[in-house]
Every structure is written in structure tokens, then in C-alpha cells.
Amino acid sequence: MSSGTLYDKVWDLHRVADLPGGSTQLFVGLHLIHEVTSPQAFSGLRDKGLKVACPERTVATVDHIVPTTSQARPFADPLAEEMLSTLERNCAESGIVLNGIGSGRQGIVHVIAPELGLSQPGMTVACGDSHTSTHGAFGAIAFGIGTSQVRDVLASQSLAMNKLKVRRILVNGQLSAGVSAKDLVLHVIRTLGVKGGVGYAYEFAGSAIEALSMEERMTLCNMAIEGGARCGYVNPDQTTFDYLKGRPHAPSGAAWDAAVDWWLSLATDAAAEVDDEVVFDATVIAPTVTWGITPGQGLGIDECVPSLSMLDPGERPIAKEAYRYMDLDPGTPIAGVPIDVCFIGSCTNGRLSDLRAAAAVARGRQVAKGVKAFVVPGSEQVARAAEAEGLDQVFSEAGFEWREPGCSMCLAMNPDRLEGRQISASSSNRNFKGRQGSASGRTLLMSPAMVVAAAVHGRVTDVRTLALHSAS
């Protein structure tokens, strides 16, 4: 095996051929598909008389379009029903496992693959979804692809790629109480910008990263793409192995021991050189909330909307647009901004640990009058585990709606949508204009615990001012 960074090693292990122009044909170890970006890809295969090359390396689920209130078939939305039926037919014809509704394994694609043990160190993972970088939390190289590339991977189990540079995001120290991985990644994106990572893979390292749980690492890598990086990863360690052991698709017995030895060898060598390194101090990071229309427009909870004079010249045009769209003036404290809708869920923050953190704030409190609040577990497994712990009751008693799994209001390709000029506190990953349904709806990104704090006060609130209530 070559020496160097994990990225270098995984790249070399999966190289099929060097192509003219400097790109490389890479073997794809795991291909994840869903109902939105796969129909045209399958049609493209049929048009060329091709079949799926490696159905055993292809895994499907339905997530983007599924309703979260009632998942009875047929869906009320005929387009959603058609998309799901098409996925079912394509998977059946191609011999692809579909983790469908009611299977006990359905959910957001970037939630179910890790919980099933499909995402493993040293893999290359591809999916027709921007947030495929999530799987880098395991020490994999994972990247989102477009529909035409989905077709190519279905046909050849490989993909033409240009090799990225590696930037180490070194985070020293420890996060303070009340500060989460979501706050950390929003802080990184705010600092480096939404285009700062273009051309890079982000290697997250340092004592603060090592202290994160696997689900927190998934949150971190999930949003690497929002900082412009094509992928983000964390070197595998004991935390990785403890998470994977015993999961359905993880190795077992002697194969487990051999896998762990190999996974450890993939980690970036101590003497390996990276192309760039940026150092952060975890101790100074506060709960972070976006104020604008990109994930890079973030603020610590004690800060105010910046004036143009505080911004670099290149940031000013988008800031002007954000002032108008968000109806927030320079100098407005982010704490205290009123909220209409509160959403907990998504591939960023819809896992069991996210729901536990949110429930600790919600327990014994009530959603403010006039605020609509709901919780959408990231998968059927997450939902059933949360219900077994009574978290659904905690949320329901606090005034949150408890829903069934799906992407929900992260992108509103389903009935969960903002209306008019509503403003949401959301644990999702994108705050683009119109992202959550309404063309004029507004989104403030924050951690699940911060969403609950906003819900109970009806405005953006520092969760650190609220006492946490553990289960009795």
C-alpha cells in the first residue's frame, strides 16, 4: 500500500486506470441510490442495452419524497407514488436490495448505510446526492454524483474522477458544554467560506475530532460539501470500530480482526504531507446559527448580523441579498430572531444521539404558542429506538409532532414545507432561498438542541441558558 494520507491510500487502492487529461477511473465499492436521481439513470441503461454491473454493491432506499405523516400506499401525491413505484420496479428487475417503507431498514440514505454497517473504512462510496460526504466519517472517500454519473456507476461500478488536494482541518481542544458538532462545522464553513474547500478533500483531525462520537463525525463530514470540499473524512479509530462491530454488514469473527488491522493501516501516516492545514480552537466555538442564505453566513449566538464594512468585498453582494431576503438588518442580534417553524431531522441531524440531545432540552418544557414544531427521525431504526426510550413521548408532551422517517423539510420534495414568509429553525444543512418549500421561506440552521431552545421560546435562544432534564 502507498504511504501518505488516507485519501491517497484509498485513491490508489481503487484506481482502475489513468485517463487522458489527468483524470482517473476509480472503482466504486458502494453505490447508494434513491428515488430521485436514479430513474433517468436506469432509463439510460435500458437505452443502451446495458444491465447493472454489480447489484450486490448497490443499495437502495426511498427518502426524499416520502410523506412523514402517513406512509400508506398509494401516496396522496401521484408523482411521489410514481417515483417510488419506479424505484421498486428498477430494483426488482436489477436484483438490487431496496430498503423500503416498513422493512425496518428504510430511511434517509446517509442514515441507513452507516447503521446497517455498509459504510466502512477504506471504501469509495458514491450516491446521487450532495451529502454523500457523510460516509467519510468512517474513513471512506465518499462523494455525491449527478444522474449521468449514477448511470455510469450502475453500468461499470466505476467513475472518472480528478484527484483532489487534501486540506487538514485541525481542531484542537474540546468543545464546551452546549456546543455540538453542528456548531463546529458551521464555524468552519463560516471561517473558510462556502467556496473555501473547492478542489480539496477535508481531513478532519485533532483532539476535538477524536472526542466526537461516530454520529457527530457524520454531522461534520455531511456538511463538508457546504464548505466547497468534494468530500470530508476522519481517520478510523476505536470509536469507528466500536460503532461498526456487530452491525449487519460488518465483518465478524476472524474477518473482523483482520478488517480492523487493515482499517488501522489506512489512517494518514504521521509523516504524511497535506496540501494545506487550517487550525481551529474548539474552546472558543459557541452555539452557531446561520443568519443569511448560505451555510457560510453563520454567527455565534452572542453576535449580530454583520454590516458590510465588517465583510470582505467579495462577501458583500450576497450579504446585501441576504439582508433583503431574510428581512434582517445589520446589527440585529441573532439571539431573539422570531421563529415560526422548528424542524429536527435530516441526514445531518436525524440520528438517535441528535434526538436524545434535543429531548434533553424539550423534557418538561412546552413549544411556544404559534410555533409549529416537528421531529422526523432519520430512519425506521432510529424511530423505533427513540420510541423504545420514550423520546417520542417527550417530544409529544412538549408540543412537537412525532413523524415517520424521511428527508422531510430539509428540501421539501414532500408535503413538509414552509408557507409564505415563514422562518424556520432547522437542524438541516442548507438555508438557500426557497430550500424548505416556499419560494420566500427563510431558514436558520442550527443544532437540534438549539432548535428546541428556539421552539420553546419562539425565538432564537442560547441553549446554554436552559437547564437540561435527563430521563427519570
UniProtKB/Swiss-Prot annotation:
The keyword Membrane does not apply. One of its GO terms (molecular function) is metal ion binding. It is an enzyme of class 4 (lyase). Its EC number is 4.2.1.33. It catalyses: (2R,3S)-3-isopropylmalate = (2S)-2-isopropylmalate. Its cofactor is [4Fe-4S] cluster. Keywords: 4Fe-4S, Amino-acid biosynthesis, Branched-chain amino acid biosynthesis, Iron, Iron-sulfur, Leucine biosynthesis, Lyase, Metal-binding. SUPFAM superfamilies: Aconitase iron-sulfur domain (SSF53732). Binds 1 [4Fe-4S] cluster per subunit. GO terms for biological process: L-leucine biosynthetic process. Catalyzes the isomerization between 2-isopropylmalate and 3-isopropylmalate, via the formation of 2-isopropylmaleate. This is 3-isopropylmalate dehydratase large subunit.
